[in-house]
């Protein structure tokens, strides 16, 4: 998607786990657990170019890397679906999200993200869990939660902007959304945890590649 991406000199265990989980396939996200527990640095190199220093995976970034970059990287996947439930005064209804997640548990369906507003909540799921099950799942949500509105989006792509220094760097989100606006990409979903290790944006599948390139070029390209 991005031609000739720039190599990362250094990345933390937490950053590489986020990037791997969201599609950067150099290392499986579970492969980092044993070395992370004991703090062993990992050096990833290209077998066709062994003299290149490659990428070091470490517990903490060096001051040089912190000063030279705002994010660790950008990664994404395009195989997700989204269900949005709207209900007036949802915020006053104790256990609403608990019951929603209970429906997913009853159907053995894991969820990826759960962004919410005062009167609505969305769940993002891998599409593979919903094959042949959408109608039944939506019916159970209707019976359990009695929503005013229920929307199913069958295909959405997620892009993760990852970096431990984002929490200490003003303007990261503004830069992301400015790049997407300039590229003409409409954002369907935004999610960011309190740790600010990553920002997740959801876009239409047709916008996936242009969005990924726009964000990459804004920070790295």
Residue positions per predicted region:
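C-terminal catalytic "cap/lid" subdomain
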Residues: 1-221
């Amino acid at each position: 998607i991005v031609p000739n991406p720039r190599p990362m000199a250094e990345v933390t265990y937490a950053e590489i786990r986020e990037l791997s989980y969201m599609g950067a396939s150099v290392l499986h996200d579970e492969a980092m657990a044993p070395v992370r527990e004991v703090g062993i640095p990992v050096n990833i190199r290209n077998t066709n170019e062994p003299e290149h220093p490659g990428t070091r995976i470490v517990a903490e970034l060096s001051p040089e890397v912190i000063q030279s970059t705002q994010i660790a990287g950008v990664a994404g996947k395009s195989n997700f679906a989204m269900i949005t439930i709207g209900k007036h005064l949802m915020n006053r209804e104790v256990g609403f999200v608990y019951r929603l997640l209970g429906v997913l548990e009853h159907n053995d369906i894991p969820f990826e993200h759960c962004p919410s507003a005062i009167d609505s909540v969305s769940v993002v799921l891998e599409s593979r869990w919903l094959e042949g099950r959408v109608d039944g799942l939506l019916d159970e949500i209707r019976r359990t939660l009695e929503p005013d509105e229920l929307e199913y989006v069958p295909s959405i792509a997620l892009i993760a902007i990852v970096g431990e220094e984002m929490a200490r760097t003003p303007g990261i989100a503004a830069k992301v959304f400015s790049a997407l606006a300039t590229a003409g990409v409409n954002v369907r979903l935004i999610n960011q945890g309190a740790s600010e290790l990553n920002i997740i944006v959801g876009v239409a599948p047709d916008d996936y590649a242009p969005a990924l390139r726009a964000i990459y070029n804004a920070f790295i390209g």
